[in-house]
Amino acid sequence: MKSLLLAVSSGLAVCVATALAQSDTATAKKDETKIPASSAEEVAVIKTAKGEMIVEFWTDVAPKTVENFKKLAKEKFYDGTCFHRIVKGFMIQGGDPLTKDPAAQARYGTGDPGYKIKAEFNDRSHTRGVISMARSQDPNSAGSQFFICHGNPSFLDRQYTAFGKLVKGDDVLEKIATTPTHPPDRPNKRMGVTSIKIVPANSMHLP
C-alpha cells in the first residue's frame, strides 16, 4: 500500500506527518461515482464525542466533492466512525469506514467507499476550520476520508480539495485536536463520530 508523507516544519524542528495519507487498497474500485445535481443550500452537522460541529459547503468551487460528502452522510456512511488521526496544530482526520471496528486499528486510514472521485483543487486556502479531502499520492484518489484544519496549513492549497468550513463548533475542534495521542497520531481515547447529518441551513441557528 502507498501512502503520502507530508513534511511539516516548525522553527528548526521538522516533523514528518502522514496525517493526510489515505492508502490505496487492492480491492478499491477506481471508477468515479455518479453525483446528483446539487440540492438546496444545506449544512452538515457533525455530532462527535466532544460536541457538534457545523460545516457550510463550498459548492461553487467543489460541487462534486460536496455532493459526494452529502451522499455518504445521507446514507449514514459516516455514522459510528471516528477521528482516527490527530495532529495538534495541523488537522484532525476522519471518514474511514474501517474505524467503525475498534479491532481494525492496524488498518485505520486505508478505508474508502469503494470508489474514487476526481480532485477539485481550487483557490480556497486551508485555514483553521476548513474541511478538505484526504487522498493518497494520486490526486484523484479521494473517496470518503476528510480532514478539518486545526492550524493554517496553506502549503496544502491547490493540492487538496477544500470544500467547506466550520461555521460553528470551533471549541469542539479544539477539544478533539488537543486530545492526547500516541504514534501514529492516534488519540488515546476514541474520538467517535456519532453521526453526520445534512440539514437545511435555515433550520440552524448560526452566527
What is each residue range found by the language model?
Residues 2-9, 15-207:
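Cyclophilin-like peptidyl-prolyl cis-trans isomerases
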